[in-house]
């Protein structure tokens, strides 16, 4: 369950009210801001599952089923499989095109650094994922990225070339806020992971994810997102910077 579906489950009105309360309590010094789009959903009465409509339509007329995996092609060589690439944020080069997992920078920035076209993949869990978002520095690179993901039996989705993409930015910022919570004595790491897994239906907690990608990757990704977006709320928490 992703964050948007989760807000439908909780209730858009409940989620928006809590977000505003937390934001106001910290005088705006939070890792997030209440979203006007969510307020518009509340005003429209689209409260989520309980009202039959929220981000998604629960009237039974539509389906939010996962996409069907796309058939493999010759790029499905074993050394390119994500589980064979080692820890952290691995990368490969295919026909002069660099393919790497996002480290917070856009594909265009990565291409300037590499001096070559670049495909940037969003984070995904290799064992369970059925789809993956990616950005590319040009259309030729995008074609290679789509073919590679299809070879991995993942449905490829080209998305806007933004810092941190979608999943990685979301997970990194959740880990950032979780680090703040530990520093403030709200809970310890195990407690936060358990609360999000069993209370909010997360498949894993933010600290478990951070262990998988590495603390240095969390910090560098957040720094790149903060620089690329210009939003200070993405600046790494002292919890993470003190551990690298």
Predicted regions and their residues:
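NAD(P)-dependent Rossmann-like dehydrogenase/reductase catalytic/cofactor-binding core
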Residues: 1-244
């Amino acid at each position: 369950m992703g964050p948007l579906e989760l807000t439908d489950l909780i209730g858009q009105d409940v989620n928006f009210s809590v977000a505003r309360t937390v934001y106001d309590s910290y005088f705006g010094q939070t890792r997030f801001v209440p979203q006007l789009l969510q307020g518009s959903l509340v005003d429209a009465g689209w409260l989520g599952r309980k009202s039959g409509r929220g981000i998604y339509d629960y009237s039974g007329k539509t389906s939010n089923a996962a996409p069907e995996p796309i058939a493999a092609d010759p790029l499905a060589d074993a050394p390119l499989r994500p589980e064979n690439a080692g820890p952290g944020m691995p990368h490969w080069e295919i026909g002069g095109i660099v393919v790497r997992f996002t480290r917070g920078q856009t594909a265009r920035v990565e291409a300037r650094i590499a001096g070559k076209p670049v495909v940037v993949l969003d984070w995904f869990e290799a064992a369970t994922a059925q789809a993956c978002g990616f950005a590319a520095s040009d259309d030729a690179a995008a074609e290679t990225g789509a073919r590679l993901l299809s070879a991995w039996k993942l449905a490829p989705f080209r998305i806007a070339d933004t810092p941190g993409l979608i999943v990685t930015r979301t997970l990194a910022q959740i880990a950032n806020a979780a680090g703040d919570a530990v520093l403030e004595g709200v809970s310890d790491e195990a407690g936060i992971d358990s609360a999000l897994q069993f209370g909010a239906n997360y498949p894993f907690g933010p600290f478990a994810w951070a262990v998988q990608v590495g603390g240095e990757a969390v910090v560098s990704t957040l720094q790149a997102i903060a620089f690329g977006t210009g939003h200070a709320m993405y600046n790494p928490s002292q919890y993470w910077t003190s551990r690298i």
